[in-house]
């Protein structure tokens, strides 16, 4: 399973319609409005890393009223998950 976060900038006043259009794309598992440089963050999941770009460009990119997007692929490494489960030591 491959996943990525996509930071999306929209035309002013179109945040809501872009949000709803993205939300109904089957590969989108999360969508959240943001305050700041980007209007939305969307999380997508697919079976393979090589299809992440297709979903970002051909599905989300064609939603309309998007001025820019940045895709951030997630690196899923089971050893990383194991390390993160270890409690952090306090630093003195």
Where are the model-predicted features located?
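A compositional/biophysical signature of low hydrophobicity enriched in polar/charged and small residues
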Residues: 1-92
